[in-house]
């Protein structure tokens, strides 16, 4: 997320780089939220999962602490004393024009917030202390290893040592320390982030910063217990029971000394903002609301309780919130069909959609109701497009790296279901909602139906050992979620049949995907976007794009995202070769809603169009098609009995494994590699062969939408 304002605060010759978000929020009498830096081993990027959700409602300030990020790096331990770092907080408040602030600190930053609040009670409205690392005389196993003592080994906390950092293996310490910070299972993404944020950390500077914090090397260190007793503002302490950096007893002592409120996170580690972002963001919001003037706080007084079911709807029509995955258009097409069938069964239901582009384009063409909250969603399609190379998308890694967007969009959802009452939520591959509801089951106060057409993150056949470990770990987390919190989903619907599910294992030592899905899902059969028999005049459709009697029409489409541009260009390059092989061939290139047709070169016998809301009609009116490899487009062609050439995205595990399995069930096995499709003569040969070999597909069921609606209607 980009800041609204940036600048520097200068104090004692040290410049501190700050950023401000949500600048339009808050009145002059309202405090800002300041997300404090922490130990100089990382910069302020570790707040990435807090900034977006909080900045929608509050003014939020972050800054790189001295010695990190874009701020200056003074030398010597005295420059990094707790008093210096605490004084930096006030300097940033002054530079940003902030009279009062709620301070949110992680680890050693809690000490700085305590000193700032004790010295400037008029400036600090409240403190949220996360995993505090204060210098209390509390027994800790790590204390047997002295930071400035002799180097004692390569393992564990023995690596928290000045000599080890400067003369041995600083990287080994980073890997150990961030592993301890992120001690919860399934924290691979968080560990990667912290290692990345620490990549440019200078061990000599970190020695200075650590000695300054500990009062070594001539740095002054005040009595922190005395400073805690001097704090007058409200203090909330949150600490995990599995914190391996500082034990829970440190947080309990801080709460005792400040008269603060203690929040214990069962199983929580040290890096709670990264591993428990929904909980931390809710706590920050609650602390902020308590610090607001009465007139401002009144706006949130009617918020519902944090857990439990709401009261009955008292005679009003049942309300449904529908979420449809925005990665492509296939989900939207089938979800509209399901919604239509659901209304046929329950005409009284009111359906709102929480949706973003390109799903919103489909919904508008069907006159569906898009909830205004949709405008705050961050674009998942744009992220996927930035992750894509030339017809190359590591779909698993792209989803992993979308964590900031997914958390933001879940926050939109959470605020919506907190402010409005919905009886049922339907999530079609709404990954963020399913994941974070399992992480925060107390937020569920509605019935939840989960839809998907594939189950299981799978490594590509040529995957590295690391990818195999990660996919298995993500699958294991999902299985644990489902085992522990079965009540989160009231109905799991697989959009397909049992034979469509891959036979692979979730990972080494994990169950068979096919067996597990059959035990945990209901099956709707495939859901077509619209019944093919609705096409009454294919000749008219063909004529719209220049087809004359005797012409053959090849429809070229790459789905609803913008990742198909490379394939479209390769197809256009091959048009002369294809016409040479099939002289009466014409082309309709459908670029979709996220690729501008004008960006492609005009080509003889080729018509181009962007988004076609009734694409299925043109697919059924075609003679052959060239497609990217997404499930919906391929299955619509199978349902229409049309030959096609599919070119799956490289490294896209769903298209290359799950979709291929599905198509094989209908007798549509086989595809063209992109390297082959990029050779005009090979693509022309594939199209010519497809035209001369009429396909023999297994018939596709047409009642999938009705079956899915029937399964869902039971929840209303």
Regions found by a protein language model. Name each.
Residues 48, 52, 62-108, 282:
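Active-site loop/oxyanion-hole signature of alpha/beta-hydrolase fold enzymes
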Residues 118, 125-164, 646:
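Flexible "cap/lid" loop of the alpha/beta hydrolase fold
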Residues 139, 163-220:
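Conserved alpha/beta-hydrolase catalytic His-Asp/Glu region
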Residues 318, 345, 349-400:
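Conserved nucleotide-sugar phosphate-binding/catalytic loop shared by glycosyltransferases and other
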Residues 507, 525-624, 676:
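Donor-nucleotide binding loops and adjacent catalytic segments primarily
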């Amino acid at each position: 997320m980009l800041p609204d304002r940036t600048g520097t605060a200068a104090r004692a010759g040290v410049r501190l780089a700050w950023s401000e978000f949500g600048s339009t929020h808050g009145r002059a009498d309202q405090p800002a939220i300041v997300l404090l830096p922490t130990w100089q081993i990382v910069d302020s990027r570790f707040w990435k999962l807090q900034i977006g959700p909080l900045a929608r409602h509050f003014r939020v300030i972050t800054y790189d602490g001295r010695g990190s990020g874009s701020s200056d790096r003074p030398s010597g331990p005295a420059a990094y004393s707790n008093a210096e770092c605490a004084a930096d907080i006030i300097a940033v408040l002054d530079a940003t024009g902030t009279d009062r602030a709620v301070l949110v600190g992680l680890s050693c930053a809690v000490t700085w917030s305590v000193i700032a609040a004790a010295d400037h009670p008029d400036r600090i409205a409240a403190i949220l202390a996360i995993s505090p690392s204060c210098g209390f005389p509390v027994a800790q196993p790590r204390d047997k290893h002295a930071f400035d003592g002799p180097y004692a080994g390569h393992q564990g906390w023995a690596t928290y040592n000045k000599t080890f950092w400067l003369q041995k293996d600083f990287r080994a310490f980073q890997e150990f320390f961030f592993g301890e910070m992120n001690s919860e299972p399934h924290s691979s993404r968080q560990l990667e982030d912290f290692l990345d944020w620490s990549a440019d950390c200078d061990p000599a500077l970190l020695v200075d910063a650590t000695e300054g914090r500990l009062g070594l090397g001539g740095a002054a260190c005040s009595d922190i217990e005395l400073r805690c007793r001097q704090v007058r503002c409200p203090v909330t302490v949150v600490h995990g029971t599995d914190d391996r950096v500082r034990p829970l007893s440190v947080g309990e002592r801080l709460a005792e000394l400040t008269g603060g409120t203690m929040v214990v996170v069962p199983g929580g580690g040290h890096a709670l903002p990264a591993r428990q972002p929904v909980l931390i963001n809710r706590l920050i919001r609650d602390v902020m609301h308590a610090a607001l003037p009465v007139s401002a706080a009144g706006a949130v007084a009617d918020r519902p309780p944090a857990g439990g079911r709401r009261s009955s709807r008292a005679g009003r029509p049942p309300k449904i919130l529908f979420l449809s995955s925005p990665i492509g258009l296939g989900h939207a097409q089938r979800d509209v069909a399901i919604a239509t069938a659901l209304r046929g069964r329950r005409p009284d239901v009111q359906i709102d959609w929480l949706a973003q582009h390109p799903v919103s384009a489909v919904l508008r063409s069907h006159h569906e109701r898009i909830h205004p909250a949709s405008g705050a969603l961050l674009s998942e399609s744009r992220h996927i497009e930035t992750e894509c190379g030339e017809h190359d998308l590591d779909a698993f890694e792209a989803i992993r790296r979308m964590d900031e967007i997914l958390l933001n969009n879940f926050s939109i959802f959470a605020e919506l279901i907190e402010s409005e009452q919905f009886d049922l939520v339907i999530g079609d591959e709404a990954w963020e909602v399913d994941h974070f509801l399992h992480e925060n089951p107390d937020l569920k106060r509605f019935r939840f139906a989960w839809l998907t057409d594939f189950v299981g993150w799978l490594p590509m056949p040529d995957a590295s050992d690391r990818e195999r470990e990660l996919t298995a770990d993500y699958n294991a987390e999902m299985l644990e979620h489902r085992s522990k919190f079965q009540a989160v989903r009231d109905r799991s619907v697989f959009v397909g049949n049992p034979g469509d599910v891959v036979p692979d294992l979730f990972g080494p030592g994990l169950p068979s995907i096919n067996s597990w899905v059959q035990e945990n899902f209901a099956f709707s059969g495939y859901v077509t976007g619209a019944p093919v028999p609705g096409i009454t005049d294919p000749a008219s459709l063909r004529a719209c794009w220049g087809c004359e009697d005797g012409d053959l029409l090849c429809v070229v489409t790459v789905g609803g995202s913008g990742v198909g541009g490379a394939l479209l260009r390769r197809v256009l390059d091959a048009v002369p070769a294809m016409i040479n092989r099939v002289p009466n061939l014409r082309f309709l290139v459908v670029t979709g809603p996220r690729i501008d047709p004008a960006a492609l070169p005009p080509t003889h016998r080729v018509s181009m169009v962007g988004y076609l809301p009734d694409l299925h009609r043109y697919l059924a009116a075609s003679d052959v098609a060239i497609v990217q490899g997404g499930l919906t487009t391929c299955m619509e062609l199978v349902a229409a009995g049309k030959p096609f050439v599919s070119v799956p995205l490289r490294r896209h595990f769903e298209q290359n494994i799950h979709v291929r399995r599905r198509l094989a069930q209908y007798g549509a096995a086989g595809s063209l590699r992109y390297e082959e499709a990029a050779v005009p003569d090979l693509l022309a040969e594939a199209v010519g062969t497809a035209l001369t070999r009429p396909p023999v597909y297994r018939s596709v069921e047409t009642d999938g939408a009705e079956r899915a609606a029937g399964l869902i209607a039971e929840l209303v």
